[in-house]
């Protein structure tokens, strides 16, 4: 039998008013800073390790593709780019919609909401995958319509068809990662990713070399590796009993009340895709330059470089999103604010470090990827600009994590739209083609976008009303339709918001 605990909205407001009368110190103590830094590190470090392992696995796939043949490498690269734009970025963005729901639910002590959000998100991603698969089935026709080489388009079609199982696997993998991270469980994620990558190497040799499946084997090996990650993750969590505090057996409830998940997932997806796609647009613009092969190759090297550097702020962004969500769900707005302050401070240090790295290796970095002198010179010219971009990219990425933890993905999406497409794109096109800055003009456009994005994101973080966000978190976790009754009381004719929240708590 479940009995309801009634939490008065008036009492909640009174508690927050009391906090305002006795506010936390403006400057946190050294002990508080150290404690929060440890909390962020415990979440971010395993995430960084997992991301670096995934980066290595991607490099292994490209290495096998390159050894098969130049045409196969081109077809596989085209398929991977199309899959990233239309599939993987979409699923990753949609899955982030569950991030604030899970982290705030965990902080609020709502275990059933955690597992239901996981189940609903998996179903939502599988449903979305049906639409994506329909698009992938027509990749060859789409590429020929866009005047791509028929031979490369045919190979790309074959490669992406072999990637469909991987798309479905990602519909489980992304939600599982967020579900566990919201509870502070990160070690299984790193171990599972490592196991999948170790398995990836012999699987490539077996499918590509032993069975002779060529570049189709590379795609199948990637799908098999991700499937192993999911199996390993589920098995580890289940055997260790890590699921027990929050798991609810799937029922008809997971087919209902999708509103909060979808409402947060769509703007999260838009925000991720707007930024992700901008880099693909830069590659397309390179193809319009004189002698495009050199700038396109250099752009590929630089995007790989910025992807490597992005691992660190993105992992910190995921960590602070979880921390902010947990603290808001627990009705501790001051601790959520502290987490944001510490994370953004770390992001500034990350930006300086990444910038120094880009400047320091500018003359030698290109040699790691190619012996072509023209490509190396172009890469060396753009790397210092890339370094300046990181000064904005690191803070804005972590700031986006803070905003995501407060369940405001629409805010982040609007900022990305304005910064990358209303500022960055005009600057890039204008400098590249009208002012004749060429290849470096594209990167100056990215610099303008990153500066604008960082400024707006940090302004949003700095002006956040944390007490208000704590109330929003209570509403989000208490009005989701799960074992909750909401009673509204009309006062002076005003029915603008609920005045009483009734949360049921299981009792023996």
Swiss-Prot record:
Where is it found, in Gene Ontology cellular component terms?
Answer: late endosome; late endosome membrane
The entry's note on the tissues where this protein occurs is: Detected in the part of the veins in cotyledons of 6-day-old seedlings and the basal parts of the petioles in older plants. Highly expressed in the vascular tissues of hypocotyl in dark-grown seedlings.
Query: Where does the UniProt annotation locate this protein?
Result: Late endosome membrane
Topology class, membrane: Multi-pass membrane protein
Please give the Gene Ontology molecular function terms for this protein.
antiporter activity; xenobiotic transmembrane transporter activity
Which InterPro entries does the record cross-reference, listed alphabetically? MATE_euk, MATE_fam
Going by the UniProt record, its keywords in alphabetical order are: Endosome, Membrane, Transmembrane, Transmembrane helix, Transport
Q: Which Pfam families match?
A: MatE
Bilayer-crossing residues are: 48-68, 78-98, 122-142, 156-176, 189-209, 222-242, 270-290, 300-320, 341-361, 368-388, 415-437, 441-463
Which GO biological process entries does UniProt record here?
A: leaf senescence; root morphogenesis; xenobiotic detoxification by transmembrane export across the plasma membrane
Say if the entry is tagged with keyword Transmembrane: yes
In terms of CDD domains, this protein maps to: MATE_eukaryotic
> What NCBIfam families does this protein's entry cite?
matE
State its role.
May act as a negative regulator of hypocotyl cell elongation in the light.
Q: What else is known?
A: Overexpression of DTX52 alters shoot developmental programs leading to a loss of apical dominance phenotype.
Q: Which family does it belong to?
A: Belongs to the multi antimicrobial extrusion (MATE) (TC 2.A.66.1) family.
Identify this protein by name.
Protein DETOXIFICATION 52
Organism of origin is Arabidopsis thaliana
């Amino acid at each position: 039998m479940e009995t309801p605990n009634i939490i008065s909205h008036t009492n909640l407001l009174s508690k927050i008013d009391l906090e305002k009368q006795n506010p936390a110190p403006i400057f946190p103590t050294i002990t508080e800073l150290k404690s929060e830094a440890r909390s962020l590190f415990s979440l971010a470090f395993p995430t960084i390790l997992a991301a670096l392992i995934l980066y290595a696995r991607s490099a292994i796939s490209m290495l096998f593709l390159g050894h098969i043949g130049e045409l196969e490498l081109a077809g596989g690269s085209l398929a991977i780019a199309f899959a990233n734009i239309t599939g993987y970025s979409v699923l990753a963005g949609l899955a982030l919609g569950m991030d604030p729901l899970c982290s705030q639910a965990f902080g609020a002590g709502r275990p059933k909401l955690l597992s239901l959000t996981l189940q609903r998100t998996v179903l939502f991603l599988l449903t979305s995958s049906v639409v994506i698969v329909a698009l992938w089935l027509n990749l060859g026709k789409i590429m020929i319509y866009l005047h791509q080489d028929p031979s490369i388009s045919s190979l790309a079609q074959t490669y992406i068809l072999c990637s469909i199982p991987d798309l479905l696997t990602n519909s489980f993998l992304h939600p599982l990662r967020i579900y566990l991270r919201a509870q502070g469980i990160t070690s299984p994620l790193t171990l599972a990713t490592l196991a999948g990558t170790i398995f990836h190497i012999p699987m490539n040799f077996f499918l590509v070399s032993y069975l002779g499946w060529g570049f189709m084997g590379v795609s199948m090996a990637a799908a098999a590796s991700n499937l192993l990650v999911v199996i390993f993750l589920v098995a580890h969590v289940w055997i260790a009993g890590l699921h027990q505090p929050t798991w609810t057996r799937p029922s008809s409830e997971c087919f209902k009340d999708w509103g909060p998940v979808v409402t947060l997932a769509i703007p999260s997806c838009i925000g991720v895709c707007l930024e992700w796609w901008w880099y693909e647009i830069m590659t397309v613009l390179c193809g319009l330059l004189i002698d495009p092969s050199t700038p396109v190759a250099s752009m590929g090297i630089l995007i790989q470089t910025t992807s490597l550097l992005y691992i660190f702020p993105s992992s910190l962004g995921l960590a602070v999103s979880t921390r902010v969500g947990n603290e808001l769900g627990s009705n501790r707005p001051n601790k959520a604010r502290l987490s944001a302050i510490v994370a953004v401070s770390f992001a500034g240090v990350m930006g300086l470090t990444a910038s120094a790295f880009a400047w320091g290796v500018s003359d030698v970095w290109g040699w790691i990827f190619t012996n072509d002198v023209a490509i190396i010179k172009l890469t060396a010219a753009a790397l210092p600009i890339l370094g300046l971009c990181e000064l904005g990219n690191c803070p804005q990425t972590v700031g986006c994590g803070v905003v995501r933890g407060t369940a405001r993905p629409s805010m982040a999406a609007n900022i990305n739209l304005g910064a990358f497409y209303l500022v960055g794109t005009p600057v890039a096109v204008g400098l590249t083609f009208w002012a004749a800055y060429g290849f470096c003009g594209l990167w100056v456009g990215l610099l303008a976008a990153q500066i604008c994005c960082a400024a707006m994101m940090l302004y949003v973080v700095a002006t956040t009303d944390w007490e208000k966000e704590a109330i929003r978190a209570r509403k989000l976790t208490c009005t989701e339709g799960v074992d909750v009754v909401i009673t509204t009381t009309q006062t002076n004719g005003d029915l603008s918001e609920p005045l009483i929240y009734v949360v049921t708590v299981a009792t023996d």
